[in-house]
């Protein structure tokens, strides 16, 4: 697996242990100390070395006591529970690139002029439906396209503009 940043190395160790041995490992002294002190939403994204998506799962708000556990659980889910893909097999591990995104708290958007698909991710909400799109996604160059995809993910009709919109930033680690 490929990734240099310590947060990414933690995600890689988690995925390798889970995929190879079925073990959920606990964070230890090799995990950066700040991950034990911080809570935030986090996404773990897996790509093949050819750039194609292989898995992406995350949380936009913290659900665990600390970021080390948030990354751990989302790393396992990205490798094994993304409904778009079969679980990652041990044979694939050498050809997977891992990214970890740490999300800022979402803030309400009053006007779409406050959005920028390169800088901000979006969350669209209507009733119990919710769709999220991370920022700076290849091929997503306009606010309209970003909102269209987020609505699609939520199961909200593209033409329905009666939605709540939130934006967030990410710290992206590779």
Swiss-Prot record:
InterPro entries named in the record: AMMECR1, AMMECR1_dom_sf, AMMECR1_domain, AMMECR1_N, AmmeMemoSam_A, Uncharacterised_MJ0810
AMMECR1 domain: residues covered: 2-174
NCBIfam families: AmmeMemoSam_A, TIGR00296 family protein
Protein name: Protein TM_1551
């Amino acid at each position: 697996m490929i990734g240099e940043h310590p947060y990414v190395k933690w995600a890689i160790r988690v995925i390798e242990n889970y995929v190879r041995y079925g073990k959920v490992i606990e964070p230890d002294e090799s995990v950066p100390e700040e991950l034990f002190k911080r809570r935030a939403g986090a996404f773990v994204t897996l790509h093949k070395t050819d750039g194609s998506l292989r898995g992406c799962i995350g949380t936009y708000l913290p659900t665990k006591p600390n970021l080390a556990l948030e990354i751990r659980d989302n790393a396992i889910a990205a490798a094994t529970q993304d409904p778009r893909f079969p679980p990652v097999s041990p044979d694939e591990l050498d050809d997977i690139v891992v990214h970890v995104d740490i999300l800022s708290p979402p803030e309400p958007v009053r006007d779409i002029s406050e959005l920028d698909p390169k800088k901000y991710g979006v969350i669209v909400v209507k009733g119990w439906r919710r769709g999220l799109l991370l920022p700076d996604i290849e091929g997503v160059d306009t606010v309209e396209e970003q909102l269209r995809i987020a609505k699609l993910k939520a199961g909200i009709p593209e033409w329905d503009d009666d939605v709540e919109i939130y934006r967030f930033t990410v710290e992206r680690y590779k």
